[in-house]
Amino acid sequence: MNPLRRKRLLIILAILAGVGIAVGLAMSALRENINLFYTPTQIANGEAPLDTRIRAGGMVEQGSLKRSGDSLDVTFVVTDFNKAVTITYRGILPDLFREGQGIVALGKLNADAVVVADEVLAKHDEKYMPPEVTKALKDSGQSRLARIRSLPRRAK
């Protein structure tokens, strides 16, 4: 084989190997950082994987928030108006976290079907709802507008 051809072939093989390694590393990083969103119904039906980082979201049920007296542990229930799932969190909740509001919790589902969250995200204004939560509520036949319309009206 001609020395010039051999040199070109080695350069091409080195470039291909480098591109292959770069693609492999990128795919590995993406696989580790993907947190799939699951609704409370999907979690209750067993569709969410155990011990894998997921995002769970919905509306915080009224009266479900329980704070520990001696630590930062918090337990609350999130619903999509079909099913509900319990979420535990250790830390300070966001200032905008309230019962009856939409949230997304990032954490792992344990064998007791409880999401152990390490991060809780709350909506940041009155009109905003996380896209995943909005879609889940629409899929369940519930929406904020439908809930508002169902509230009793005040007499004038």
Curated annotation (Swiss-Prot):
Keywords: Cell inner membrane, Cell membrane, Cytochrome c-type biogenesis, Heme, Iron, Membrane, Metal-binding, Signal-anchor, Transmembrane, Transmembrane helix. One of its GO terms (molecular function) is metal ion binding. One of its GO terms (cellular component) is plasma membrane. It is a single-pass type II membrane protein. SUPFAM superfamilies: Heme chaperone CcmE (SSF82093). Pfam families: CcmE (PF03100). Heme binds at H124, Y128. Residues 30-156 are periplasmic. Residues 1-8 are cytoplasmic. The chain crosses the membrane at residues 9-29. One of its GO terms (biological process) is cytochrome complex assembly. It is found in: Cell inner membrane. Heme chaperone required for the biogenesis of c-type cytochromes. Transiently binds heme delivered by CcmC and transfers the heme to apo-cytochromes in a process facilitated by CcmF and CcmH. Belongs to the CcmE/CycJ family. This is Cytochrome c-type biogenesis protein CcmE. It comes from Pseudomonas fluorescens.
